[in-house]
Amino acid sequence: MKSTDSAKCLGSKSLAICCLLLHLLLCIRPAVSQTQSPQRYLHNVDSNSNNNERLHQILKGSGAGSGATQLNWPQPPKQTVPNVKTELAKLNNTYVYQNAWPANNVKLGAVTAVSFDKAGNVVIFHRVNRVWGQTTFDNRNQYQEKYRGPIRESTILALEPATGKVQYDWGKNFFYMPHGLTVDPEDNVWLTDVAMHQVFKFPPRGGDGKPALTLGDAFQPGSGRKFCKPTSVAVLDNGDFFVADGYCNARILKYSRKGELILFWGQNTFSGISYDVAPQNFFAIPHALTLVPELQLLCAADRENGRVQCFLSSNGTFHSQYHNQLIGDRLFSMAYTPAAGGQLVIVNGPTAELGIHPEHYNEVHGFVLSMRSKQLVSKFGPNNLQFQNPHDVAVTADGNEIYVAELNPMRIHKFVHRSLAKPMSLSASKDSRDSAISQAVGGDQVPAVAVHHPSGKAILVASLMLLFAGSTFALALIFARRRKRGCLPFGARGRRHAWEKSDGFKLGGLLDRDRNGFEKLDQQASDEEQETKTLASAQYA
């Protein structure tokens, strides 16, 4: 009897457990079905449907009415923001800086452009003693220093690529504010002068000093068939050419070999509708041009948008763009080489903020970007350090040599691919110069050096002195850190720091700010907007 009761009890418990499991199963299945049944996206709507139909569909799927389910919009992929400093440190330095190039007797002003002639010489354009300052142009882009006359010295120099010696020079008594230089396949030299608002074509090596073709009206800025501070020229094999009308008009123009206008395109990022991200064909100073013959492309350095835009050279149709967060928001110039499947060699620029701590971390380098992957391959700089104000760049067709024109310091830099050159340190360069000096003054005699062996007492005294100096330095460092953090009862707790900036101290704050993501840029803004302690000391280009 007892065993029968136990069996009944066990059977009842088993039945209860089975019922509970069945109940849970019935509850779970509808829940799973409910989460899977609603469609994640809206139904396709015919492109001819009107806006009312689209609005009705959105309302129908967004919870209006009973029984409607919540619509889950597809979210754009989240982009991780890289640590710029860390990622830059990972990039390889594939080019070696040539300290001893050019020759010591080459005297330069601000170097604005660099190209190659048919003989392989490095041809540069420089401003000698002219500086683009705050008062160089008025608010109407009129040049204010015409009274000084043209630059008296040669503004174009051709340097031998191996030795850096001057092979020939020209361009005296003609230019006022040099900017762009391009040597075309026929060895003609194309130049732009931002003060004169003109574009010039000269015969090889300058000919007799007179331009074979002149576009624009001297010292008369404008639009239409006039220019306003043109920046660069690129020339096709058939003689047709492009002009970047950069600082004011933000456009690119294509001309026939004879100088007849074929077409033009481009809109100014700093006028009209405000955009968070600049659309295609918009420019914030098209600053340099380069050709990609294999793809029949013309590429432009969109300076203040920090990108390269490429277009079909036949009709100006947008093709592609290249940008990388490690380059930053300012991209001054680029040059193309077919090496390694096609690469762009790029130089960026310093932050446009003057006299304050930059809002975003920025390093000024040369970069090599693969056009296939759109990824940075390597970086380079003088002695693997940063540039200050690079303005233009040129690269040989084989990609083995790179030349960078810099405004300040006023230099032309040479880099050679590491597979072809041995690195030479600054100390080695200094030693070689010191050796040359010693040979000049007295030959190769090496002075005798007396070797002194310190005693144990001297070593003890020196050790105590070093220990005292080290402890003093450590205390001073701790004191300085605590004072900076405000841990001391006195000091700089109430002082305003440079990074606690306000709009009043920012260059952009001096201009109108009415767009999201971009600051209005003064169309007179120069290339040489380097970080300085005060606005008054800032140079322009």
From Swiss-Prot:
The chain crosses the membrane at residues 459-479. The lineage of its organism: Eukaryota, Metazoa, Ecdysozoa, Arthropoda, Hexapoda. PANTHER family: PEPTIDYL-ALPHA-HYDROXYGLYCINE ALPHA-AMIDATING LYASE 1, PEPTIDYL-GLYCINE ALPHA-AMIDATING MONOOXYGENASE. Disulfide bonds join C228-C248, C299-C310. NHL repeats lie at residues 164-205, 215-258, 272-314, 374-418. Peptidyl-alpha-hydroxylglycine alpha-amidating lyase that catalyzes an essential reaction in C-terminal alpha-amidation of peptides. Mediates the dismutation of the unstable peptidyl(2-hydroxyglycine) intermediate to glyoxylate and the corresponding desglycine peptide amide. C-terminal amidation of peptides such as neuropeptides is essential for full biological activity. This is Peptidyl-alpha-hydroxyglycine alpha-amidating lyase 1. Widely expressed. In mature larvae, it is ubiquitously expressed with a low expression in all cells and a stronger expression in a subset of neurons. Colocalizes with neuropeptide proctolin. In adults, weak expression is observed in most neuronal cell bodies and in scattered large cells throughout the protocerebrum and also in the subesophageal neuromeres (at protein level). Residues 521-541 are annotated as: Disordered. The keyword Disulfide bond applies. CDD domains: NHL_PAL_like. Keywords: Cell membrane, Disulfide bond, Glycoprotein, Lyase, Membrane, Metal-binding, Repeat, Signal, Transmembrane, Transmembrane helix, Zinc. Residues 34-458 are extracellular. It is a single-pass type I membrane protein. Its main location: membrane.
